[in-house]
């Protein structure tokens, strides 16, 4: 980033990034940009490549189709929930996630400009509890081991939103009206974890 242009942000993901169940200005990506601006950072509107229901394959195809032009000063990656929900084995998910991580790295000037997020725990939501939650939770734990290891191996930054997502078990106000996705209040919790890491990446 230079002083004569605003920071460019690319957010890659699925429903958790696009903000399914909340207004666009209530999703964590929008909140992050606004918080950075409030703290004096010049930030362009984030480029968001994400949709409800997307798997790694869907995201891969969308990146090809939308062809965002880098470099970006900050790239975020949050993907895997739908692979897990569709019962894709961790061994199959791992190379797909690493491929998406490689793509994220390709849009950034260096690995420390990439922020990888863990996959939120959806098994404690009403929808999650109706779909073999123990089996999904076990698979999701392995998925997040893959996510963390990928971030470590590539030297990216990592934000763990799993603890925040688990708070829905005690506070239903953190769940959107669809009984699955995060409510604005949960996006706020994520922001508190994401913001300092993203701000450091832009330093």
Predicted segments with their positions:
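Short acidic active-site motifs
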Residues: 58
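Alpha-helical cap/lid subdomain in secreted, periplasmic
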Residues: 61-203
């Amino acid at each position: 980033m230079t002083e004569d242009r605003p920071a460019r942000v690319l957010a890659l993901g699925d429903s958790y990034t696009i903000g399914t169940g909340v207004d666009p200005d209530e999703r964590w990506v929008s909140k992050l940009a606004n918080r950075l601006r409030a703290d004096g950072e010049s930030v362009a509107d984030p480029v968001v490549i994400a949709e409800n229901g997307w798997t790694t394959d869907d995201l891969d195809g969308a990146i090809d189709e939308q062809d965002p032009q880098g470099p970006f000063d900050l790239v975020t990656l949050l993907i895997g929930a739908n692979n897990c929900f569709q019962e894709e084995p961790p061994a199959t998910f791992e190379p797909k996630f690493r491929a998406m991580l490689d793509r994220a790295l390709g849009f950034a000037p260096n690995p420390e400009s990439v922020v990888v997020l863990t996959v939120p725990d959806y098994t404690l939501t009403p929808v999650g509890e109706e779909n073999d939650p123990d089996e999904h939770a076990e698979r999701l734990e392995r998925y997040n081991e893959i996510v963390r290891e990928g971030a470590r191996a590539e030297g990216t930054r990592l934000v763990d939103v799993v603890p925040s997502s688990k708070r829905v078990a005690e506070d239903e106000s953190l769940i959107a009206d669809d009984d699955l996705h995060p409510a604005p209040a949960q996006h706020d919790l994520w922001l508190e974890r994401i913001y300092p890491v993203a701000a450091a990446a832009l330093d």
